[in-house]
Amino acid sequence: MKIVHICISAPYIDGWGYQENLLPKYLQQAGIQNAVIASGNDFPFYLSTQEISDIKAKGENYTIGEVYIKRIKTKRFSTSFLVPFHLMDAIEAIQPDVIFHHNFNCTSLPIAARYAKRNNIPLVVDNHADVLNMSHNRIWAFVYYKLLIGLTCKAIQKTIVKAYGVSHSRCDFIKEYYGIDQKKIDLLPIGADVDIADTIPSKEILRQKYGYQETDFIVVSGGKMGVEKGTDQLILATERIRKNNPNSRIKLVLFGKIEDEDTLLQAKQSQVVTLFDWCDRIKTLELLKMADVACWPIHHTTLIEDAVAVCTPLIIRKTDTTEHLIEGNGIWIENGSAEAIERAMSLLLNQDEMRKSAMQQGCEKMKNRLSYNTIAEKVVKDIYGSRQ
C-alpha cells in the first residue's frame, strides 16, 4: 500500500513534531510506503529565514527517513485561500493507493477527490478546525466554512471514506459545518511521538543536568503563554503553595514565549519561576520529563501530547478539545483560576506512594493509547475496512 499525504493547507515543516510529520513516519515504520506533497514556497510566518532556506535548499524532491517529500508551487491569495499548482501531476507521478488530505480548508481537496474518484481509491481527510480557532467574523465564517468548504464537501462526500477530527469538538465541527455523514466521522487524536520520547534520559539524570534536586516538586508549562493561557494564575498558585508550605520545594519551569508584559514581569519577579526561551524538540521533552506535573490551565496545546509521551502527569482544564487526554494520568480542573490550580497541585504534592504508583500506571496507559504506533494502526484498519 502507498499513501500520499496532501499537506498544502496544513504546512509540512521538516523535522517538526506535528501530526503531518509523525503520521507518515509511523505508517512507514508499519511497512507502508508514504509520500508527502507540500508547498515549496509558502511557509508559516513563525519560521526563520534560515529554516526556510534550509528547506528550499533540499529542492523539490527528497526523503526524510524513508518518507518521500515532494514540494510544489502554491499561490496564497489571502490568509484562508491557498492554491496549489501541478498537484494532479504530482499525485499521478506517485500513483498512491490512498490519499490522506490534511485539513478540509484548501483548494487541494477537490483535486485530491477527483484523482481518488477517477482511480477508485480511498480518500481520508482530517480536521483541525473548531469554533474556537475559526474566524470570529461570523459572516465570513459562515461564507467560508459552511458555504465554500461545505458545498465542496457535499460535492465530494461519496469519495471520502473517513473524516477524522483530532478532538471530539472537531469531529462535531465536521458534521455541523461541512455536512459530512456521521458514519464517516471518527476521532483520530493528535498522538504521542513515543520513539523520540523513549530516547530521553531518566528524570534523575535530567534533574542533575538542569540543576534540580530529587526532592524538588517541579511543575512545568510552556509554549505561548500569558494571561489568555492562564500562566499568571499558574504562577500565583505555585507561589501560594510555596508560601503556605515552605518545605514543599515547589518550583515552576516555564519555556517558550510569554506574550504579555504583565505576566512576563510577574514571572521574572517570582522566586519560584525559572524561564527558558523556545526549546528544540529534545530539550522540550527533557523539561517535560524531569517535571512532576505539566499544567496548561485553559487551552489545549500539542505540548500536552508531548507530556503524555514522556509519562508526566497532567493538570488541564476539561474541554471538548482535551476530554480524551486524562484517564488516571492527571487531574481535571474546572477553570483556570489560581484556586483550582492550587487545589490540583496540592493533591499531587501530597500523594502517598500507592497513589503515585497508580498515577504512573495511568500515564503509561495513556502513552500507549496516544502512541502514533496505535494511531497508525487505526488508520490502516479504517482504510482496509473501507474497502470491504
Feature annotation, model-predicted:
Residues 4, 164, 213-229, 235-238, ...:
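Conserved donor-binding/catalytic core segment of Leloir-type glycosyltransferases
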Residues 262-282:
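Nucleotide-activated donor-binding/catalytic signature segment of Leloir-type glycosyltransferases, i.e.
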Residues 313-316, 320-323:
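Short hydrophobic beta-strand element within catalytic cores of glycosyltransferases
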Residues 288-299, 312-313:
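Acidic donor-binding loop of glycosyltransferase active sites
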Residues 40, 169, 191:
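Carbohydrate-associated surface elements
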